[in-house]
Design a protein with these regions (language model features):
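Helix-loop boundary and gating motifs at the non-cytosolic
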Residues: 7-57, 209-247
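Helix-to-loop junctions at the C-terminal end of transmembrane segments
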Residues: 62-75, 159-160, 257-270, 356-357
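Juxtamembrane intracellular "pre-TM" segments in multi-pass secondary transporters
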Residues: 2-10, 182-216
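Conserved MFS/SLC helix-loop-helix module at the cytosolic interface between two early adjacent transmembrane helices
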Residues: 62-96
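Hydrophobic core of transmembrane alpha-helices in multi-pass small-molecule transporters
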Residues: 21, 91, 101-119, 217, ...
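Structural signature of the two symmetry-related core transmembrane helices
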Residues: 79-93, 273-287, 369
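Cytoplasmic helix-loop-helix junction between adjacent transmembrane helices
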Residues: 109-143
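Symmetry-related core transmembrane helices of the 12-TM Major Facilitator Superfamily/SLC fold
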Residues: 166-183, 363-382
Length: 393
């Protein structure tokens, strides 16, 4: 009996590993090259490309909480995930047939709507599972980082051989395969014992949850905006497009080992201490870029993304789920993701563009550093709130 349970645990973990690898392989193969496709193949202007690329974070602000509510209300997150994975892959496939700018805008909005459900619901299911079996979320999630890193090289090479259209075909095939795998993920369901509206309202009335949303905005906003501006920074200080690819590979690849040790560090040092450490290192990285160091040193500092993302994501997700009532956990994770991936990403991307137009790309990173350090400061406030609660003050 014990052996059977152990084998089942191994099989479920293998499914999770394969699932996360596929999802991030698809994302890593499409989005880093999408702007190149729109510019070089479709011949859209820089402004048009910028508008299309900025649609996703705006849509996510509204769509991610909606999918969380749907998942919690139906109590069928696995079915919701299978459906949205399939729709995301199909919409991505249709990109390859389009040449009109306005159709691209519509497709980008639809793609973002379905895609916005993938990571929050997947993470919620994974966290629910590892908490039940006393497992390690980081050892599962790191395969997403590996999938992204491998995809940057593999799909980039395929694009050179077969043309940039291949990014949509790979994206569609991989996400459909992930949809099939999602069927075998463990079920996550809770008995609804309060009205959902009351549950969501209770989340927004929790001072610690609201403060953590602000922290997520300040820390994750610059991290996601960096995906848009880092290539400009590299080329501005003398790097090449190949160098940009190497930098993204190093950054994404560095997340995996830190995700592997994240659970052990969280248990040893505590969630909030890990959040402070990862946010502080992220802030130092952005401030360091403000002084425009030599290119070789910039490449070396990409490993800081392992600290900032590889440690912050597991600790933040666990904190949100532990904080939220059981019946609205997916909603809580979705709101958290919408604030970081959506609102924070949009604000920092938009604000960064204004700063870039008036000053320089180095100044953009200086602003990112200041925002992140404010986020780090608020984590100290959150830690103090936790300590006061424990001491009964």
């Amino acid at each position: 009996m014990e052996l059977a349970l152990k084998n089942e645990k191994v099989n479920v973990k293998t499914i999770f590993i394969s699932y996360y690898f596929l999802i991030f392989f698809g994302i890593g193969g499409l989005f880093p090259l999408l702007s190149v496709y729109l510019s070089d193949v479709v011949k859209l202007s820089g402004a048009q490309v910028g508008i299309i690329m900025s649609i996703s974070p705006v849509v996510m602000i509204f769509a991610q909480p909606l999918w969380g509510i749907v998942s919690d209300y139906t109590q069928k997150p696995r079915f919701v995930l299978m459906s949205t994975l399939l729709c995301t892959g199909v919409v991505g496939f249709f990109f390859s047939f389009v040449n009109d700018y306005y159709v691209f805008v519509i497709l980008a909005a639809i793609l973002a709507f379905f895609q916005s459900s993938l990571i929050p619901i997947s993470d919620s299911i994974a966290l629910n599972y590892v908490q039940k079996v006393n497992g390690d979320y980081g050892s599962i999630r790191l395969w997403g980082a590996i999938g992204f890193a491998v995809s940057v090289l593999a799909v980039g090479r395929l694009s050179e051989v077969f043309g940039l259209h291949v990014i949509f075909y790979v994206f569609a095939v991989v996400l459909v395969a992930a949809s099939v795998l999602a069927r075998y993920l463990p079920k996550e369901s809770q008995t609804m014992n309060v009205r959902l509206r009351d549950g969501v309202s209770s989340l927004l009335k929790m001072p610690k949850f609201v403060l953590f949303l602000l922290i997520t905005f300040l820390v994750f906003g610059p991290i996601f905006a960096n995906n848009f501006y880092f290539s400009l920074y590299i080329t501005d200080i003398g790097g090449t497009l190949t160098g940009v690819g190497i930098a993204f590979l190093l950054a994404a690849g560095s997340e995996a080992p830190f995700m592997k040790v994240a659970n052990g560090w969280i248990r040893r040092f505590g969630m909030l201490h890990i959040l402070i450490l990862s946010a502080f290192i992220s802030g130092l990285r952005w401030l360091f870029y403000f002084i425009e160091p030599p290119l070789a040193i910039v490449y070396a500092t990409t490993i800081a993304q392992g600290f900032s993302v590889g440690l912050f994501i597991p600790a933040a997700l666990q904190y949100v789920r532990d904080l939220a009532p059981a019946n609205v956990r997916v909603t809580a994770v979705s709101i958290y993701a919408a604030v970081g991936n959506g609102l924070g990403s949009w604000f920092c991307t938009f604000f960064g563009g204004l700063v870039l137009e008036k000053y320089s790309i180095a100044t953009v990173y200086g602003c990112f550093g200041v925002l992140t350090m404010f986020g780090c400061l608020f984590i100290f406030f959150l830690r103090r709130m936790e300590q006061e609660k424990e001491s009964g003050i």
